[in-house]
């Protein structure tokens, strides 16, 4: 139970629901599989999967929830081919060109006919509510995926007073200064990956991997017209990640020595290991995020 990505949000006021109420509300919007005519379905599942019996997993004031999504797979090419065949046949029969509205209606019919036979794929997105610090963390690689969970959570709770974390300073300017000056914040270390974007429209993007980010080559790019928009960092020799200009952490990796702290727990005891890993992860992230915020000059006041 270790998040691989972090989309970070701040509660503008404390979450007012107690655990029992939250549990009931989540159950009301529990996951139900797609019916024959459903394109997709969203709902809450037990964070511990088959080993769980609750829609929340609690460790102190830390609450873990899990969204499940099922999507029917309808290849666009198949729909397009069938639509073209039907349009061609009808136009030939009626001796006229079909209007856009008629084509759209035909397309909808084709989708409805294909849905019952379509394969489906499922995915899960975890979120962690830190009721102690009034934060919400979503393990999602994109804002769009995080918003999917947030939208259902807002519907589930009736309201969800959160805003994305906002920095006082521009992240790209701060990261550019770090590489230009070689002045990395204490307790952080550069890794070997970055993305540099031109300040000029259409000026290009440079993606660096396995690169010395303090080299003259990188500095030459920065002294021209480039800004650092993504940067690989390691904090306290414990957690490595890539941070972007929108304050999202991706490709998070917890050091082996950190994860091995729970190796003494019997692997067959899934519940105990899950609980210990969640407690370990939340404890580390609750130290990491304030350190990252401080490195970037602090959080903008609400």
From Swiss-Prot:
InterPro entries: RdgC
Compartments, as annotated in UniProt: Cytoplasm, Nucleoid
GO biological process, one term: DNA recombination
Main location: cytoplasm
Pfam families, per the entry: RdgC
Coiled coil: none
Keywords recorded for this protein, A-Z: Cytoplasm, DNA recombination
GO terms assigned for molecular function: double-stranded DNA binding
GO cellular component, one term: cytoplasm
Role noted for this protein: May be involved in recombination.
PANTHER family, A to Z: RECOMBINATION-ASSOCIATED PROTEIN RDGC
Similarity comment: family membership: Belongs to the RdgC family.
UniProt name for this protein: Recombination-associated protein RdgC
């Amino acid at each position: 139970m270790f998040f691989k990505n972090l989309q970070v949000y701040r509660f503008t006021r404390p979450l007012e629901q107690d655990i029992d109420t939250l549990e009931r509300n989540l159950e009301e919007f529990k996951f139900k599989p797609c019916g024959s005519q459903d394109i997709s379905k969203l709902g809450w599942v037990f964070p511990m999967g088959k080993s769980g019996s609750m829609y929340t997993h609690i460790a102190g004031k830390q609450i873990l929830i899990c969204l499940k999504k099922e999507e029917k797979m309808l290849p666009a090419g198949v729909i397009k081919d069938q639509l073209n065949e039907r349009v061609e046949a009808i136009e030939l029969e009626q001796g006229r060109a079909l209007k856009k509205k008629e084509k759209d209606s035909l397309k909808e019919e084709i989708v409805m006919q294909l849905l019952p036979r379509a394969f489906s794929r499922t995915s899960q997105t975890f979120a962690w509510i830190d009721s102690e610090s009034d934060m919400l963390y979503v393990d999602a690689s994109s804002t769009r995926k995080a918003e999917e969970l947030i939208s259902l959570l807002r519907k589930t709770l009736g309201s969800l007073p959160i805003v994305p974390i906002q920095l006082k300073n521009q992240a790209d300017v701060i990261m550019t200064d770090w590489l230009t000056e070689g002045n990395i914040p204490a307790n952080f270390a550069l890794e070997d990956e970055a993305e540099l974007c031109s300040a000029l429209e259409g000026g290009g993007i440079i993606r660096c991997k396995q690169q010395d980010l303090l080299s003259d080559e990188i500095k030459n790019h920065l002294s021209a017209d480039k800004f650092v928009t993504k940067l690989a960092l390691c904090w306290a020799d414990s957690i490595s990640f890539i941070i972007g200009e929108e304050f999202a952490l991706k490709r998070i990796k917890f050091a082996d020595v950190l994860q091995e702290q729970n190796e003494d727990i019997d692997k067959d005891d899934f519940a105990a290991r899950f609980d210990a890993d969640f407690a370990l992860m939340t404890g580390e992230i609750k130290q990491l995020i304030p350190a990252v915020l401080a490195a970037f000059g602090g959080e903008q006041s609400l």
